[in-house]
Amino acid sequence: MKLKTYQKMRRFLTFGSLILFILLVACINNQSKPVREHMRDSVSQKGDKIASTHFTGTAWLQMLVNNDSTYNTSIGVITFEPKARTNWHKHPGGQILLVTDGKGYYQEKGKSVQFLHKGDVVKIPPNTEHWHGAAPDKEFIHIAVSPRTEKGSVVWLQPVTDEEYNRIIQ
């Protein structure tokens, strides 16, 4: 009798372990693959065309992380066509730009322009007036990280004039 009980218990544990293993594999596969695929798709797509008076030229935005009260951060991929650029603006919580492709410019008010290429990182202090955009001959793509959004939204200022922009490229 003890042998039969032992065999039943062993079968039950083996069967239970097998089911638990299958469930774990299914859960891991269902959670990890779609997240990776979603991120890859998001970063490789241009996103939505930005219809705003805060930009000169054509640019697209693909949001990766929408702002919320838990993380107080928004992250988006911005793609600028050649010559496209933002207006002068500032972020109460600062901003970080991670250049992923192309050739572009970044300038703080009263300072020289910085030329940006793939791999460059720009850390912009809070409330620093600046603009960024593409070179005249090449698309420009960067990931924009806006931390500490609880400090307030971006403050848009005047456009970067064609005269200002053209002075840079000469």
Task: Please give the residue ranges for each predicted region.
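Bacterial N-terminal signal peptides that target proteins for export
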Residues: L3-G16
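Short beta-strand His + acidic residue motifs that chelate non-heme Fe in jelly-roll/DSBH
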Residues: W88, Y106-Q107, E129-A135
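C-terminal motif of bacterial Sec signal peptides marking the signal peptidase cleavage site
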Residues: L24-A26
